[in-house]
Each structure stands twice: as C-alpha cells, then as structure tokens.
Amino acid sequence: MAKKSMIARETKRAKTVEKYAAKRAELKAIINNHESSDDQIWEAQLKLQKLPRDASPSRQQRRCRITGRPHAVYRKFGLCRNKLREAAMRGDVPGLVKASW
C-alpha cells in the first residue's frame, strides 16, 4: 500500500494538469506554428516555462486504483500486477482467463 501522501500528491498533479491543459496547448501551438514570428515563439516559451512544473502531463505517474502502487500498473485495467492477478483468479475481470497450453 502506497503512502496516503503520495496518492494525494498524484491527485493534486492530475488537477493541476487539467487546470493548465488549455493554456499549455495554446502556448505549444504558438511554438510549433511555423508562421509565428521569433518574438512570439520566444514569449510563448517563456510563458510555458513559468507555468507550474506539475502542469506537465509527463510528470503524472499511473497508480493502482486499489493499492496506489506506482510500478507494474496495467493501463487497460488500472490495476497493478498483483491485484490484477487476484481479480482474475476471483473472476472479477470479464474476458480475462489464465493461459494454459
């Protein structure tokens, strides 16, 4: 089980990313537009750098919905490998069966 503070930190990051998503997209569009002048690009880069560090989506960490474990989390299920195995053995995950050959 992950510390409660780490789980809270991730939820706070998710809210920050959501809050600044439109502004980041707007600034990145200016930067990536080839028709923008050098001054516009420069100002957009400075504004982008002044946004909070946690506003970047790449700083988010996928965590298990049950335990909060940060590693070995399957995107499709949102569970870590341990809890996914337990859920599959109980039959809680529809369509997922243990391989046998």
Swiss-Prot record:
Q: Which GO terms describe its molecular function?
A: rRNA binding; structural constituent of ribosome
A Pfam family hit: Ribosomal_S14
Q: Where does the record place a coiled coil?
A: none
Q: What is this protein called?
A: Small ribosomal subunit protein uS14
Report the function annotation for this chain: Binds 16S rRNA, required for the assembly of 30S particles and may also be responsible for determining the conformation of the 16S rRNA at the A site.
Q: Which NCBIfam families match?
A: PRK08881.1
Subunit details: Part of the 30S ribosomal subunit. Contacts proteins S3 and S10.
One GO cellular component this record assigns the protein to is:
cytoplasm
Does Zinc-finger appear among the keywords?
no
Supply the SUPFAM superfamilies for this chain.
Glucocorticoid receptor-like (DNA-binding domain)
- Is Ribonucleoprotein set as a keyword in this record? yes
Please cite one Gene Ontology biological process associated with this protein. translation
> Which family, according to the similarity comment?
Belongs to the universal ribosomal protein uS14 family.
Q: Which UniProt keywords apply?
A: Ribonucleoprotein, Ribosomal protein, RNA-binding, rRNA-binding
Q: Which InterPro entries match?
A: Ribosomal_uS14, Ribosomal_uS14_bac/plastid, Ribosomal_uS14_CS
Q: Which domain of life is it from?
A: Bacteria
